[in-house]
């Protein structure tokens, strides 16, 4: 498609969104845009503002305060976009124009959090018959919901931290003394469907529990109460569809009480990363195998970052599977692949190729009943 006389592949980069991770998404989008191979790809920038409206953005100036993670913002273009599900082509249309946009060949969604990586956006793109980077509806939805993900991982024979789950309607039944007796202190209280440690609290005493529960319920209708796991925080990147590969492992060394949103994206001194992690080859292989098993158990595709705790007794406890990991300047996913021999640009290219391959495979499936004479 990119040879002599052939046009470049048009990549729709979708970013922003209504979630609490809006700013993280903007940082990721900026980096991915810079990493796109200009010889092969033509970017089309689609920003979603905090009200959920889609806008066609200019490549040169789509961000405000791009170098400041605490102030970065989406510059509104004023040109709204609509999606036309079911069309074979021209699925994106400017609402103030007569004609559709030039055909987008593949979408790279980098909308973190609710509505972006929980299967919602993936379902819309699938209905619009657009290839997209990353996991499909099922893998995205299950991995995003920490309660459901833990149940699936546990059933697959992987160890997860002991936990209890409460909804907005059952939160009054969350007895802190019972939870402390069951899990000990500290406890972690977190929204079931958020990422980047948004709304997460470490509870060190019974008196701190109510405020932590209230904070988590501001971000989700379902809340997880989790036992703290004493162990090193190790991360492994996974790449691929049916036959995924695992990267070298990295370690997050947290200087604060836990790996909070501020520590991850705002402060420069809250944590350090060590790549590759200082672990022996056998331990790394075990973690890689657990990461691959978790990836396939959750029906992931394209990419995911698998976070685990490595305990002093050698146990590997799965903490989280992130199907849409960050691509910011400090994000582990691209760093892990770079340490494994795959540079940032090659990684982005491979993710786009995987999206096109999966879409082609899906296109071979029957969409109606086939009868034989």
Swiss-Prot record:
The reaction(s) this protein catalyses: 2 D-alanine + ATP = D-alanyl-D-alanine + ADP + phosphate + H(+)
Coiled-coil residue spans: none
InterPro entries for this protein: ATP-grasp, ATP_grasp_subdomain_1, D-Ala_lig_Van_CS, D_ala_D_ala, Dala_Dala_lig_C, Dala_Dala_lig_N, PreATP-grasp_dom_sf
Gene Ontology, cellular component aspect: cytosol
Residues reported in the UniProt entry to bind Mg(2+) 1: 307, 320
Binding-site list for ATP: 180-235
Keywords: ATP-binding, Cell shape, Cell wall biogenesis/degradation, Cytoplasm, Ligase, Magnesium, Manganese, Metal-binding, Nucleotide-binding, Peptidoglycan synthesis
Any single biological process term in GO: peptidoglycan biosynthetic process
EC number: 6.3.2.4
Broad class of where this protein is predominantly found: cytoplasm
Subcellular location: Cytoplasm
Pathway(s) this gene product operates in, as recorded in its UniProt entry: Cell wall biogenesis; peptidoglycan biosynthesis
Residue span(s) of domain ATP-grasp: 150-353
Essential cofactor(s): Mg(2+); Mn(2+)
Binding of Mg(2+) 2, residues: 320, 322
Record-linked Pfam families: Dala_Dala_lig_C (PF07478), Dala_Dala_lig_N (PF01820)
Textual note on the cofactor: Binds 2 magnesium or manganese ions per subunit.
GO MF, one example: ATP binding
Superkingdom of this protein's organism: Bacteria
Record family assignment: Belongs to the D-alanine--D-alanine ligase family.
Biological role stated in the UniProt entry: Cell wall formation.
Name of this protein: D-alanine--D-alanine ligase A
Gene that specifies this protein: ddlA
């Amino acid at each position: 498609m990119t040879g002599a006389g052939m046009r470049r592949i048009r990549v729709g980069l979708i970013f922003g969104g209504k979630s609490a991770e809006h700013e993280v998404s903007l940082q990721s989008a900026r980096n991915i845009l810079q990493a796109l191979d200009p010889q092969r790809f033509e970017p089309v920038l689609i920003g979603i503002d905090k009200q959920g409206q889609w806008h066609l953005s200019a490549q040169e100036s789509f961000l405000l305060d791009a170098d400041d993670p605490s102030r970065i913002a989406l510059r509104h273009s004023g040109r709204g976009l609509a999606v036309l599900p079911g069309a074979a082509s021209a699925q994106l249309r400017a609402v103030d124009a007569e004609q559709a946009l030039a055909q987008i060949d593949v979408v790279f969604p980098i909308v973190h959090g609710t509505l972006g990586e929980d299967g919602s956006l993936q379902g819309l793109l699938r209905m619009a018959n657009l290839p997209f980077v990353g996991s499909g509806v099922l893998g995205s939805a299950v991995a995003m919901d920490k309660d459901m993900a833990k149940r699936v991982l546990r059933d697959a024979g992987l160890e997860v931290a002991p936990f209890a789950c409460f909804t907005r309607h059952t939160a009054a039944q969350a007895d802190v003394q019972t939870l402390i007796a069951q899990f000990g202190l500290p406890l972690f209280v977190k929204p079931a469907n958020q990422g980047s440690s948004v709304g997460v609290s470490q509870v060190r005493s019974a008196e701190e529990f109510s405020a932590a529960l209230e904070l988590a319920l501001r971000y989700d209708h379902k809340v997880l109460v989790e036992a703290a796991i004493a162990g090193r925080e190790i991360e492994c990147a996974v790449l691929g569809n049916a036959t995924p590969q695992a990267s070298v492992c990295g370690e997050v060394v947290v200087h604060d009480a836990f790996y909070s949103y501020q520590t991850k994206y705002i402060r420069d001194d809250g944590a350090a990363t060590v790549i590759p992690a200082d672990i022996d080859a056998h331990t790394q292989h075990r973690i890689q195998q657990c990461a691959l098993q978790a990836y396939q158990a959750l029906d992931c595709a394209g990419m995911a970052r698998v976070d685990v705790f490595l305990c002093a007794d050698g146990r590997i406890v799965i903490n989280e599977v992130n199907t849409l990991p960050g691509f910011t300047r400090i994000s582990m996913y691209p760093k892990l692949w770079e340490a494994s021999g795959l540079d940032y640009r090659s990684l982005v290219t491979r993710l786009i190729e995987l999206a096109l391959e999966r879409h082609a495979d899906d296109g071979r499936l029957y969409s109606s009943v086939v009868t034989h004479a």
